[in-house]
Swiss-Prot record:
InterPro entries: Exonuclease_RNaseT/DNA_pol3, REX1-like_exo, REXO1/3/4-like, RNaseH-like_sf, RNaseH_sf. Residues 225-373 form the Exonuclease domain. It comes from Saccharomyces cerevisiae (strain ATCC 204508 / S288c). Belongs to the REXO1/REXO3 family. This is RNA exonuclease 1.
Length: 553
């Protein structure tokens, strides 16, 4: 009888089947493990980032917080600065989605609950014009405007100008020195510089009356670069134009006129202007309007005007022009910002010429500005400047932070828009609020704007360009409260809203400084300042005491 051997195929099949089952089981286990890991990772991804929190350190705040400190906090929140502020404890700054900074000059202590006499006494009081449940999320604290016991500087300028470290200054100087050859176009003020220095721009601004004119484009021969200087006398309404001198790039006087004032003169300021009643009576043949017409035939909108603090000349001429070289800006004061060098100092230091000895001469001053500009072109951008500050927005753009700046001094119908920032003209508060609401949920990290109607309603603004419409402070405050409420309700979580007055009550200081400005003799003005020093100190103290309030949704 033959005994058959085992079916090797069958055994193989059994073994293969067993292996397949083991592999299948292992595969399932591995799949299950993979799915579990995947689910865990998914849950980790779904886990929300911790919200940002900001806690005021009152013991530090009470010692004094300035606009600079708020600016540095802004840089830290936007991750353009690694040094955390010492006066506020910030956790999870990476969760910040957007920051809105609003300057609202004109705020007073009694606009807040339990309002005291000064902002220094405020301790987390709520803004009265926001509903309680939202107002309770705001944190209020005093902020000092820049200055000293005898001086007050611009809070807005302090916020938008960042001090540089020693190494940053060295690097900036090296960068400027790279471009050894420059043209006059490299010295023309940028829009942000025009805004920061209060240059009168654009015919559509309702803050300018109908007496203002604007240069227009036209073709002409000869020079396309002019230096300009004016002399002024004092009327009850302020300074008025009484002499104008225009010099071309070849240093030739091409326009020189004494101007008939259209209002009575109360002080000819002869010791400075060189103007006397007799000179004007005999020599002044043209009115301001006629001078404006002459200039519009000489200066095209595409030409360049050179002057020293030229915004003052343009204002008294009631003339708007966009292309300006300002020797008070292209050369720096030895003390740095916010000080501006005098033309006399620049002429003596860089031209080795003594000017303005006694009476001012507008031709001499215009020529000094022209020579200083030519000297700057020969020596490069680094010549005659201090490397102390950088524009906040310029710095933020280097860190890929998208910004929107809303300002009333930007040229009409011009929006500077690139991948990093927008510069939008807003003359009225309604326009500012509209653009803030429109950009609230757009891909923008920082929005900075100024609300002006409150200071107008309370006469905080020192020199309105024309008689502005009257505003009721209570109505303006309710409007501010309504907009802040809407912003909070519509903002995405992680949005910070920060409001700042910038200053305290500036009215007493405005009155004092106006009186002092009318004293043209330097020694007489200094003597008067010493005489009234106690009043000035108190007025400045009141003016520097501002407030800030913020919330994080």
């Amino acid at each position: 009888m033959q005994v058959e051997g085992p079916d090797t195929n069958f055994v193989s099949d059994l073994a293969l089947g067993s292996k397949k089952r083991r592999l299948s089981k292992t595969s399932v286990q591995e799949d299950d493990h993979t799915n579990v890991v995947s689910e865990v990772n998914k849950n980790k991804k779904k886990k929300k980032a911790k919200p940002m929190t900001c806690t005021l350190l009152k013991s530090v705040v009470e010692k004094g917080i300035g606009i600079k400190d708020v600016r540095d906090m802004t840089q830290y929140l936007l991750q353009a600065e690694n040094n955390s502020p010492k006066w506020i404890d910030i956790c999870n700054r990476s969760s910040l989605q957007k920051m809105i900074v609003l300057f609202i000059p004109g705020l007073q202590p009694d606009d807040f609950e339990n309002g005291k006499n000064t902002f220094n006494e405020i301790s987390d009081d709520n803004f009265k014009y926001i509903p309680g449940e939202i107002a309770s999320t705001f944190h209020t604290f005093p902020v000092m405007a820049p200055g000293s016991k005898m001086t007050l500087f611009s809070p807005y300028n302090s916020f938008i100008n960042v001090g540089l470290s020693k190494m940053e200054k060295i690097n900036k100087l090296k960068e400027l020195q790279k471009k050894k050859k420059i043209t006059i176009n490299d010295l023309v003020l940028s829009e942000q510089q025009l805004v920061a220095n209060d240059y009168p721009l654009d015919s559509g601004d309702t803050n300018f009356d109908t007496d203002w004119v604007q240069t227009v484009d036209f073709t002409h021969g000869g020079s396309h670069i002019f230096a300009l200087d004016c002399e002024m006398c004092l009327s009850e309404q302020g300074l008025v134009l009484t002499r104008i001198s225009l010099v071309n790039f070849d240093n030739e006087v091409i326009y020189e006129e004494l101007v008939k004032p259209d209002v009575p003169i109360v002080d000819y300021l002869t010791r400075y202007s060189g103007i006397t009643e007799e000179k004007l009576t005999v020599g002044a043949k043209k009115t301001l309007r006629e001078v404006q017409k002459d200039l519009l035939k000489i200066i095209s909108r595409s030409d360049i005007l050179i002057g020293h603090s030229l915004q003052n000349d343009l204002k008294v001429m009631k003339l708007k022009h966009p292309l300006v070289v300002d020797t008070a800006i292209i050369y720096h004061h030895k003390a740095g910002d916010p000080f501006k060098p005098s033309l006399k100092y620049l002429s003596e230091t860089f031209l080795n010429k003594s000017i303005q000895n006694g009476e001012h001469d507008s031709v001499e001053d215009a020529r000094a500005c022209l020579e200083l500009t030519k000297l700057k072109i020969l020596n490069g951008l680094a010549f005659g400047i201090g490397i102390n500050t950088e524009n906040l927005f310029t710095k933020l753009h280097r860190f890929e932070v998208k910004t929107v700046l809303l300002n009333d001094m930007i040229i009409k119908n011009h929006t500077e828009d690139d991948s990093k920032g927008q510069l939008i003209r807003c003359v009225e508060d309604d326009e500012t609020w509209t653009h803030i609401h429109e950009n609230l949920n757009k891909d923008v990290k920082l929005i900075v704007g100024r609300i002006k109607n409150l200071e107008r309603s309370r006469n905080y603004n020192k020199k309105p360009r024309k008689e502005t419409p009257s505003f009721d402070a209570s109505m303006v405050l309710h409007d501010i409260g309504q907009h802040l409420t809407q912003l909070y309700e519509n903002a995405t979580p992680g949005t910070m809203i920060l409001i700042m007055s910038g200053t305290g009550d500036t009215r007493p200081w405005n009155n004092l400084s106006t009186e002092l400005e009318f004293i043209q003799d330097k020694k007489e003005r200094l003597d008067k300042r010493r005489e009234r020093e106690p009043e000035i100190v108190e007025a400045i103290k009141l003016a520097r005491g501002g407030v800030a309030s913020f919330t994080v949704k």
